[in-house]
Regions:
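Helix-loop interface residues and adjacent transmembrane-helix termini in multi-pass membrane transporters
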Residues: 45, 75-76, 102, 258, ...
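Loop-to-helix transition at the N-terminal end of transmembrane alpha-helices
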Residues: 47-61, 76-86, 255-265
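Long, well-ordered mid-to-C-terminal structural blocks that present hydrophobic/aromatic surfaces
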Residues: 233-278
Length: 374
C-alpha cells in the first residue's frame, strides 16, 4: 500500500510540474488559439483567418516544445542533452519547412530560412543588446563561445555563396532548379550537417571547460511526462504548420505581398518567436552569454542543420530544393553575419550597438518589401 501511495505521489508531483511549466510563461497565453484553429479548419473557414490563427498558435506551441526539449536534455545529461537540443530544438522550423516543401512553396521556404538567419542575427541580437544595455554602461560575454558561433556562420555563408557562384560562373545566371546545382547541393548538405555536429564534440568534449555553465539546472518534470508533452505538442505543430502553409496564397493575394516577403518576415518570425522573447529576457537580466547563445546558436542551427536537412529531404519529394538562394537573400545573410561579427568580436556590447543591428534589419525589410518575386 505504501508503495502504491508513493507511486501516486510521484505521479501527482510530475503533473504538478507539468501544470507549473504551462503556467509559468506568458507566451503560453496564446495557447487558447489552438482549439479555434482546429474547429475552423474542419468547418472550412476563411484561409486568411486560419493563417492568422495558426500563426499565433504556433508561438506558444514552439515555446512549449522548447521548454520540454530543455527538460529532456537535463534528463539526458550534458553531451546527449546537447544533441537533443540540436535535433528537437529545431522541430518547429523543420516541420514548417517540410510542409512548405511538400506544398511546393520553395520560394517561401528559402525565404523563411534566410529570414530566420537575419532575424536572429539582427533583430533578436539587436533587441537583446539594446534592451539589455539600457541602464548599463556595457555587457560582457564569453568571446570564445561567440567566436565559435560566428565562425560556423561564416561556413554557412560559404555553403550559400558557392552554389550561387557556381551557377553564375558556369551558366551565367542563377538557376536554382538545375540538375547540376541540385546534385552539388545534395553533396554539400552532409558537409554542413557534419560540421554542425562536430561543434558538439568541441563544446561538450574537447573544450567543455570554456562552455561550462556556472549553474546546473535540475529537471522539473519527469522524463515520461516530458516525452508525452513532446509527442502531443509535435502533433499540434504539424497540424498548425499544414494549416498555415495552406493559407499562404490567400494571404499573398489579399495583402499584395510576395511569397518571399511572407517567408522572410512572417513565417521566419513565427517559427522563432519563442526563442526571440527568451533571448531578450535573458539579456534584460544581464545574462548575455545565454542571450547570445540563443540568438547566434539558433541562426547557426538553421544555416547548418535545418537548411541542408531540407535539401536532402527534398530528394524524397516531388519538389527539389537546392542551396542556390536569390542573390539579394545571399547578400542579406553576408551582411548580417558581418555586422553581428563586428559587434560581438570584442566580447562586450552596449545599447547603441543594438540600435545599429535593428537599423540594419529595418533597412533590409524595406528593400525586401519592394523587391519583386524571386
Amino acid at each position: 500500500m505504501a508503495t502504491r501511495n508513493a507511486g501516486r505521489g510521484t505521479l501527482c508531483v510530475s503533473w504538478i510540474g507539468v501544470a507549473k511549466f504551462f503556467l509559468a510563461d506568458w507566451r503560453l497565453s496564446c495557447i487558447f488559439l489552438v482549439p479555434p484553429s482546429v474547429v475552423l479548419y474542419f468547418v472550412h473557414s476563411s484561409k486568411g483567418l486560419l493563417f492568422l490563427l495558426s500563426a499565433l498558435a504556433l508561438v506558444p506551441l514552439a515555446a512549449i516544445l522548447g521548454g520540454a526539449t530543455e527538460e529532456l536534455a537535463i534528463h539526458a545529461g550534458p553531451a546527449a542533452g546537447g544533441l537533443t537540443n540540436a535535433t528537437l530544438g529545431n522541430a518547429p522550423e523543420l516541420v514548417l519547412g517540410f510542409f512548405l516543401l511538400r506544398a511546393g512553396h520553395i520560394e517561401a521556404l528559402k525565404a523563411s530560412i534566410t529570414g530566420s538567419i537575419i532575424g536572429e542575427l539582427l533583430l533578436v541580437f539587436g533587441l537583446a543588446v539594446f534592451l539589455g544595455g539600457i541602464g548599463r554602461e556595457k555587457q560582457v560575454f564569453n568571446r570564445v563561445a561567440v567566436g565559435a558561433s560566428t565562425t560556423m556562420l561564416v561556413l554557412a555563408v560559404v555553403g550559400l555563396v558557392m552554389p550561387a557562384l557556381f551557377d553564375l560562373s558556369v551558366f551565367g545566371s542563377m538557376q536554382p532548379g538545375g540538375a547540376a546545382t541540385e546534385r552539388l547541393s545534395f553533396l554539400t548538405a552532409p558537409i554542413l550537417i557534419g560540421s554542425y555536429f562536430a561543434s558538439f564534440i568541441f563544446i561538450f568534449r574537447t573544450h567543455r571547460d570554456l562552455f561550462r555553465s556556472p549553474v546546473r539546472a535540475s529537471a522539473q518534470v519527469t522524463a515520461a511526462a516530458t516525452l508525452l508533452v513532446l509527442v502531443v505538442c509535435g502533433g499540434l505543430i504539424a497540424f498548425e504548420s499544414a494549416v498555415l502553409v495552406g493559407g499562404i496564397e490567400s494571404v499573398t493575394h489579399a495583402l499584395g505581398w510576395t511569397e518571399r516577403f511572407v517567408g522572410l518576415f512572417v513565417i521566419a518570425i513565427i517559427g522563432n518567436a519563442a526563442e526571440h522573447s527568451t533571448a531578450v529576457t535573458m539579456a534584460i537580466k544581464d545574462k548575455m552569454d545565454l542571450a547570445l547563445n540563443i540568438a547566434l546558436g539558433s541562426s547557426t542551427q538553421v544555416a547548418l542543420f535545418v537548411a541542408p536537412l531540407l535539401v536532402i529531404a527534398s530528394h524524397f519529394t516531388q519538389h527539389r530544393m537546392s542551396l542556390v538562394f536569390p542573390l539579394l537573400e545571399v547578400l542579406a545573410v553576408v551582411i548580417s553575419v558581418t555586422v553581428a561579427t563586428l559587434v560581438s568580436f570584442d566580447g562586450e556590447t552596449n545599447w547603441f550597438e543594438g540600435v545599429l543591428l535593428i537599423s540594419v534589419y529595418a533597412i533590409l525589410a524595406v528593400f525586401f518589401f519592394y523587391s519583386p518575386a524571386a
